[in-house]
């Protein structure tokens, strides 16, 4: 099969010099080779074993990868490969390169969650509040018909600057970043752009801005709006998630700048609803409308056990991150502030995203749980936690 495919594709490609066709050929050939049982190379196995040794020899490393990548797991998985050719090194390389990682692993494709489950399952159970290997993600419940219960958390505007709810989605039929070809990126971008162009709902309708060839004027405006995402940080770079940048990447936003979609950043799609103030119900209602509009035309990858599939296992399940930018000057100065948030199942970040610090006394606080609960429950976890923090701040 391999030789026949190679000969036919070579003859086809010989008729032209299309870079995209050659890229598609390269990816197809790689997949055929993987399916025909080609083993993981000795060089890759050596790098896997070196990575394991590096983690074990690093006392400053406290990642979940280090905790669950035992010698037994290495020996069990080091020679395994998904149908798309991804191996254990693809899973662990970011955590090996960045010893300060919290999680340290990424899934190069959907099959990785099954093939490398001796590593993923205990790690997922640890991160996602005891989500056991035999547990199943509940059916999707975005909160339709329930959003009116989420009244404004801060009607006087004393604490909350803005509210944001996002979810990630992966398109069916495509792997995750490390296994995507340039042709894949461009094809996905073309598909979702066509969907964006057909949105007629006045609350959602807007414009798509591709990163490739973006003018300085548009770039400056998107930076001013805090919409522009940059090429991946060192964690994503090390995971091989930024290939062919900026091909196939872009940003859609509605005319009111309250609904935003990132195309091929960390996940295939990041769907975001946001606005100033603390009206969580309004933000969620808009997100529901947006997700429903997109999924009618683009099927998403969902697993019966793990829910909506994403590149990073921290986002599995609902993929929902509901957050506020909030000022809590009194209680945030207390040494047990993080412990209080942990007890409320809340996660603290700086306002510039993951791995950033607080700025000007403003914190980005969100639900921590993504897996093992419904989408609405994830939002409600943030809502109830923030209400409690505001009450503590008022009483301090």
Swiss-Prot record:
InterPro entries: ATP-guanido_PTrfase, ATP-guanido_PTrfase_AS, ATP-guanido_PTrfase_cat, ATP-guanido_PTrfase_N, ATP-guanido_PTrfase_N_sf, Gln_synth/guanido_kin_cat_dom. ATP binds at residues 162-166, 226, 270, 321-325, 349-354, 364. It holds the Pfam family ATP-gua_PtransN. Residues 47-129 form the Phosphagen kinase N-terminal domain. Residues 159-396 form the Phosphagen kinase C-terminal domain. One of its GO terms (cellular component) is extracellular space. Substrate binds at residues 102-106, 266, 312, 354. It is an enzyme of class 2 (transferase). Its EC number is 2.7.3.3. One of its GO terms (biological process) is phosphocreatine biosynthetic process. GO terms for molecular function: arginine kinase activity; ATP binding; creatine kinase activity; kinase activity. It catalyses: L-arginine + ATP = N(omega)-phospho-L-arginine + ADP + H(+). SUPFAM superfamilies: Glutamine synthetase/guanido kinase, Guanido kinase N-terminal domain. Keywords: ATP-binding, Kinase, Nucleotide-binding, Transferase. CDD domains: arginine_kinase_like (cd07932). Gene3D superfamilies: ATP:guanido phosphotransferase, N-terminal domain, Glutamine synthetase/guanido kinase, catalytic domain. Belongs to the ATP:guanido phosphotransferase family. This is Probable arginine kinase F46H5.3.
């Amino acid at each position: 099969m391999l030789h026949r495919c190679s000969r036919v594709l070579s003859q086809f490609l010989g008729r032209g010099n299309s870079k995209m066709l050659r890229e598609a050929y390269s990816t197809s050939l790689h997949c055929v080779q993987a399916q025909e049982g080609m083993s993981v190379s000795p060089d890759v196995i050596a790098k896997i074993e070196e990575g394991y040794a590096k983690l074990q020899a690093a006392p400053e490393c406290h990642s979940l990868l280090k905790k669950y990548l035992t010698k037994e797991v290495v020996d069990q998985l080091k020679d395994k490969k998904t149908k798309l050719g991804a191996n254990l090194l693809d899973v662990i390389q970011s955590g090996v390169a960045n010893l300060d990682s919290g999680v340290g692993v990424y899934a190069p494709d959907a099959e990785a969650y099954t093939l490398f489950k001796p590593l993923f399952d205990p790690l997922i159970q640890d991160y996602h509040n005891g989500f056991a290997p035999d547990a199943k993600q509940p059916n999707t419940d975005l909160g339709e018909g329930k959003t009116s219960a989420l009244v404004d958390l801060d009607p006087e505007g004393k604490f909350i600057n803005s509210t944001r709810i996002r979810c990630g989605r992966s398109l069916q039929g495509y792997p995750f970043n490390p296994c995507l070809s340039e042709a894949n990126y461009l094809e996905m971008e073309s598909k979702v752009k066509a969907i964006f162009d057909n949105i007629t709902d006045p609350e959602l309708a807007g414009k798509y801005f591709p990163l490739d060839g973006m003018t300085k004027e548009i770039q400056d405006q998107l930076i001013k709006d805090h919409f522009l995402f940059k090429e991946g940080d060192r964690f994503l770079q090390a995971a091989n998630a930024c290939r062919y940048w900026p091909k196939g990447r872009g940003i859609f936003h509605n005319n009111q700048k309250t609904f935003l979609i990132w195309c091929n950043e960390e996940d295939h799609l990041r769907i975001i609803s946001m606005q100033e103030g603390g009206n969580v119900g309004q933000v969620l209602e808009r997100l529901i409308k947006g997700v429903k509009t997109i999924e009618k035309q683009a099927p998403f990858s969902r697993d019966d056990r793990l829910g909506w599939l994403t590149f990073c296992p921290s986002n599995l399940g609902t993929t929902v991150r509901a957050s506020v930018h909030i000022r809590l000057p009194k209680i945030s100065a207390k040494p047990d502030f993080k412990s209080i948030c942990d007890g409320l199942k809340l996660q603290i970040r700086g306002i510039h995203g993951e791995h950033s610090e607080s700025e000007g006394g403003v914190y980005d606080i969100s639900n921590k749980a993504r897996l093992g609960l419904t989408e609405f429950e994830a939002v409600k976890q943030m809502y109830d936690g923030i209400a409690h923090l505001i009450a503590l701040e008022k009483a301090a």
